[in-house]
């Protein structure tokens, strides 16, 4: 077959996929090689399309200019941009070693004859390069990727006209080294005898698209409430104009006051032992009541006014027995006409599918981690490398959700037909995080789409990502059928303590004024 000539029917044709676009270098013997150096062409595939081509190079260049990173002129087996991409990629490949992750990242580029030869370096070389890169560089990259991914549509969850986000925290098991134990500690033990040292992560996740708005890292000695206060103090813009939901481990006068001062509002559950005094004539028509949170100073002038709503939650058990519990929510939205008790309750219920699902996908889906004894999530053996790896992990999962959000925005009639329903658009809660993650790994090893790639290559990559994200769909609003495992450390190390299994949808009743 002659190049440029359309083959006739039945004639054998060779179909080729472009791997890289590079200037040709012709040797004396007539051999053709690709000009350039292989590490300069490595990309993160589908993930880098959403981060932006050249962003990693910009962050590296800024670190060199600021003196945080030493510039390197001579070509070596590694480069700073390649190392950053490898750190991000290896967080999505928990089963791969450094070298195996690099081989997957390089992908088809390894088959391209480059003018300058390159081979996979040893793990020691990769580790030495990791020690050169400050954790702040990966943190800067995370903040470039963080932020809302999906605009709130007409059917989005909003309260008092504001978008909703959720704050939550999780503990991440680390490699068991003396340095990690000394730096991070182990939660739930006073003597540090837990099976693994742990990193505490607190983040803000948007309800729309479950995007990570911001995050902060710390050891186990700092509680979730302390870390969230630090995050709000550093970045008050994250909560401004938003309703922040969190569970009963977070509420406190200073934290809630800080969120309100930043321009946000709070919907939170409080523990049963928290005293919420009744204001005179405090009952409101929607069943909520006016109360306040006492300040640490104890002065009445420093009290924080809030509105409380008690709800009776009936949990149907699998054997037909109903378990009843009382749940008290508080909110800083004091006008019951703007935020009635039913709307406050409905908003709080979205917390599970926002922060709980987001953190569960990040930790459990990718790494297979379950309870606190299931093994390390992050592999680094020194505290500085742990922090860098954690920021890379958060960046990677944010880019996965950016890919899922892009699939939602590009739905065609054919994509909607995949639902086998009434041809309606797919919503974010139906997308499979696992499917998006697996496709990202596949695209990382088979496609190196860069800014110089053709428009057809970009369109093909976007179409493949959307097809993978929309092909396998979850059922939104699924009921829980698994035992709830207690977070408290069991008395004996082989004991698994569980709570009641919930197999039905809770029925919620708002207390009427004057009821007990």
Where are these regions (language model features)?
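Short Pro/Gly-enriched beta-strand edge/turn motifs at strand-loop
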Residues: 183-188
């Amino acid at each position: 077959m002659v190049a440029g000539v359309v083959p006739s029917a039945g004639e054998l044709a060779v179909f080729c996929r472009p791997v890289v676009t590079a200037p040709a270098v012709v040797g004396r013997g007539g051999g053709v090689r690709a000009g350039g150096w292989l590490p300069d062409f490595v990309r993160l595939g589908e993930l880098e399309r959403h981060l932006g081509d050249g962003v990693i190079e910009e962050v590296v260049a800024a670190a060199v200019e600021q003196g945080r990173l030493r510039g390197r002129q001579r070509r070596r087996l590694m480069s700073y941009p390649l190392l950053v991409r490898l750190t991000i990629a290896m967080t999505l490949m928990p089963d791969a070693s450094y070298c195996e992750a690099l081989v997957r990242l390089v992908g088809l580029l390894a088959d391209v004859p480059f003018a300058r030869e390159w081979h996979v370096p040893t793990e020691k070389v990769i580790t030495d390069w990791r020690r050169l890169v400050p954790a702040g560089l990966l943190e800067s990259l995370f903040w470039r990727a963080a932020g809302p991914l999906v605009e709130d549509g007409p059917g989005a969850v909003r309260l008092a006209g504001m978008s909703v986000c959720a704050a939550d925290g999780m503990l991440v098991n680390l490699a068991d080294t003396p340095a990690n134990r000394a730096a991070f500690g182990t939660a739930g033990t006073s003597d540090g005898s837990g099976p693994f040292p742990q990193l505490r992560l607190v983040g803000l996740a948007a309800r729309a698209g479950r995007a990570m708005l911001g995050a902060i890292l710390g050891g186990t000695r700092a509680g979730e409430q302390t870390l969230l206060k630090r995050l709000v103090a550093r970045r008050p813009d994250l909560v401004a104009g938003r309703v922040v939901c969190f569970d009963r481990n977070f509420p406190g006068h200073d934290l809630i006051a800080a969120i309100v001062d930043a321009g946000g509002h709070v919907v939170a559950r409080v523990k049963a032992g928290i005293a919420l005094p009744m204001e005179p004539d405090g009952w409101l028509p929607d069943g909520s009541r006016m109360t306040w949170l006492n300040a640490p100073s104890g002065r009445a002038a420093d009290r924080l006014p809030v509105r409380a709503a008690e709800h009776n939650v009936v949990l149907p058990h699998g054997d037909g027995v109903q378990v009843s519990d009382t749940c008290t929510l508080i909110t800083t939205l004091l006008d019951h006409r703007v935020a009635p008790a039913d709307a406050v309750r409905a908003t709080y219920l979205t917390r599970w599918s926002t922060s709980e699902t987001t953190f569960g996908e990040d930790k459990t889906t990718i790494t297979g981690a379950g309870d606190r004894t299931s093994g390390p999530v992050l592999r680094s053996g020194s505290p500085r490398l742990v922090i860098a790896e954690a920021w890379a992990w958060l960046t990677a999962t944010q880019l996965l959700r950016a890919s899922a959000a892009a699939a939602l925005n590009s739905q065609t009639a054919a994509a909607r037909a995949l639902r086998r329903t009434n041809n309606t658009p797919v919503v974010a809660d139906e997308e499979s995080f696992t499917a998006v993650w697996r496709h990202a790994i596949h695209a990382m090893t088979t496609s190196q789409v860069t800014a110089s790639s053709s428009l057809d290559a970009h369109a093909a990559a976007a179409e493949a990502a959307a097809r993978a994200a929309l092909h396998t769909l979850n059922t939104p609003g699924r009921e829980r059928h698994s035992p709830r495992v207690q977070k408290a450390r069991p008395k004996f190390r082989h004991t698994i303590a569980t709570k009641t299994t919930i197999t039905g949808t809770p029925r919620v009743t708002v207390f009427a004024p004057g009821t007990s």
